[in-house]
Amino acid sequence: MANPTVNELPYDKDDKREVEVSSLEVKPPVGEVVEASGDYSGFTQKTDPREIKLVRKLDMFIMPSLWAMYWLNYLDRNAIALAKLSSIEKDLGLSDVQYQTAVSILFAGYVVFGIPSNMILTRVNPPLYLCCIMVTWAVLSICTSFCKNATHLYLVRFFLGVCEAPYYPGALFLISNFYTRTEVALRVAILYTGNILATALAGLISIGIFKLDGHRGYAAWQWLFIIQGSITGLVAICTYPFLPSSPLTTRWLTPDERQLAHDRLLRDKIDEVQPGSTMDGLKQAVKDYRTWVFAFMFNNHLAANGFKNFFPSVVKTLGFNQTITLVLTCPPYLIAGVVTFFLSYSSGRMNERTWHITVSKIVAIIGFALAPATLNTGVRYFAMCVFTLGTYGVNSLILGWASTVLSQTQEKKAVVIAILTSLGNLSFVYTPYLFRNGDRPRYSLAMGWMAAFSLLTLLSAWAMKFILKRQNRNISGTGATTKYPY
């Protein structure tokens, strides 16, 4: 069957108008590609006041809810790192290796359930699904406080990973269902600041909670899990009314806004494929080699981010007391949050990914190299700030990039996001074992590996750029690339 015709416009590198696809009289069968007018640069320019108003309305309803949920997701997940500064190891009789296993086993659960969960997400009500799993992980977080030994902790942490696995890829799936390619990166960055600020503020929050040590017979680390888990469950219930399922069924949009939200995403598609089953989406994602390039890139990026589960312990090697140590964990992440926002804004504004990733990773490598090179307290803390800001800014760029390039069907996009987040989080299964107590205070082995992972992320970004440049030339048919190729 011949592909439907596409209205042709002469190529002009300075012309940023959207190219409209002619109406289709006959839909191709499932799995057949429909040639689209766009390319992988993803550049569109909003001029319609109705569309501008619509995007602002989407931002007001979607982003605060997803952000609050993700903030608590990471607050609950990172509680184990702060519990190490309390008495969890002593109370549960944990050895160094057992604590590392307790950290890593959460991500084993995450990897196991990540892909099946996102396949389910395309067949259920996403807001209800995400809020239900949030309530479940809140209960499991509270259950952590009642663990009596390493085995109990392993079980709770594993199932906590299973329940937390759907949230982040599910949130990315929702964002990519309502925003165009040029809008996604900034929204993912805003979402990701929830991760950063949770990590930044966790230490400050725990200062107050740790003062409850011994109250009603519970240790400080137990109160940490009880209080944070309770708040998580409450927020899960409160955010449900604000989360939409799809553009055409969103309750708080008018009929005209629903249609506009739907139509603008259709115009933004590349090589659209007719929707199929979840298994069709799985096959499409697995067979597309670009999925695996992005997965390799994201795995190495998160491996370079492996320090986050031990950051309070790394800061503790500076020699300050518990309260000062908790305070000092905050500034690096606050700085990283600001950098992440502006980096993603710049990336979206310039419609560029590779150089932004490159510069960030070079900064991170410098920080990882500097941290073990000296025992000077000021220089080491500066290095911690540098490798934190250099690492965190990249996350939203990679995921936003992948979710827009590989979005030919909803089913494929959901699986791609799940593959990336699952294989990315697989890195957290093995990176905890790089942070050995015997390597304190320099942690030279861990820092060396973090630098190597950063370099591999950088190189894979350049590989993807050249892949998409070649495909852009094929799409345009002129031998020219777009003004801002990825």
Task: Name each model feature, range by range.
Residues 81-82, 280-345, 395, 399, ...:
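Extracytoplasmic gate region of multi-pass secondary transporters
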